[in-house]
Amino acid sequence: MEFQDFLLAASTGDLGAAPAAPEHVDLVEFRMDLAADPLAALDDYDGVLPVLATNRADWEGGAAADGGDRIDALAEAARTDCVAAVDIERSALVDDDTADGAEALAAARSTDTTTVVSAHDFDGTPSLSAMADLLGEACSLGDVGKLAVTPQDRGDALDVIRVTHEYSAAGMTVATMGMGDLGRHTRAVTPLYGSKLGYAPVADGETTAPGQYAPAALQALIADLQ
């Protein structure tokens, strides 16, 4: 999957609810952890939009119990034709307690499936230097480095924009955003500073992360700012 321009993913745990045509969105983030039988859903998917498969662990804000089955399913998803990219948590690749993601990373690489290596903080915003370290490590491990944090003030939001610009200007492919009320506006602003991937719910009221805009609203905001 190419990230020459900003791409917007519609997030859902139900591939049957995925947009039938690419209006306002460019791909579907399939939250496998929210689906009853995610691999069967991928096999049955016949939509035109490529899929970003995410099987988010419960320790990173998702619903999947940690363990080999979670990673096995993500690795199998990476081998599925409709899947263009997979999301693997940074912690699943580097932290001693949770580092079981290597199988999914290897499966993605073997099939030329794009890897998004992600780091989330649902409680706050690390320091600017800490965010730079997290994002830099994520970029070094995957094709795209994703960082999502929760600003507590406008200074935190500004730091998200700063780290986005720093790594984008250095030629890295990044996906960055602030979550929650104080970070919401960054979802529209970071694409101006080089963020290449954003997220929105398939339908209003079905957000998968705090502060998401509806797809049409987010695309309109980004277009107006550009």
Curated annotation (Swiss-Prot):
Residues that bind 3-dehydroquinate: E29, F30, R31, R56, R187, T208, Q212
Pfam families per the UniProt record, alphabetical: DHquinase_I
Pathway(s) the chain acts in: Metabolic intermediate biosynthesis; chorismate biosynthesis; chorismate from D-erythrose 4-phosphate and phosphoenolpyruvate: step 3/7
Enzyme Commission no: 4.2.1.10
Enzymatic class: lyase
UniProt xrefs under CDD domains: DHQase_I
Gene3D superfamilies: Aldolase class I
Substrates-to-products reaction catalysed: 3-dehydroquinate = 3-dehydroshikimate + H2O
Keywords associated with the record: Amino-acid biosynthesis, Aromatic amino acid biosynthesis, Lyase, Schiff base
Highest taxon of the lineage: Archaea
Active site per UniProt: H120, K146
InterPro entries, alphabetized: Aldolase_TIM, DHquinase_I, Type-I_3-dehydroquinase
GO molecular function: 3-dehydroquinate dehydratase activity
BP GO annotations: 3,4-dihydroxybenzoate biosynthetic process; amino acid biosynthetic process; aromatic amino acid family biosynthetic process; chorismate biosynthetic process
Reported function: Involved in the third step of the chorismate pathway, which leads to the biosynthesis of aromatic amino acids. Catalyzes the cis-dehydration of 3-dehydroquinate (DHQ) and introduces the first double bond of the aromatic ring to yield 3-dehydroshikimate.
Family of the protein in this entry: Belongs to the type-I 3-dehydroquinase family.
Subunit-structure text: Homodimer.
Name under which the protein is recorded: 3-dehydroquinate dehydratase
UniProt source species: Halobacterium salinarum (strain ATCC 700922 / JCM 11081 / NRC-1) (Halobacterium halobium)
Lineage: Archaea, Methanobacteriati, Methanobacteriota, Stenosarchaea group, Halobacteria
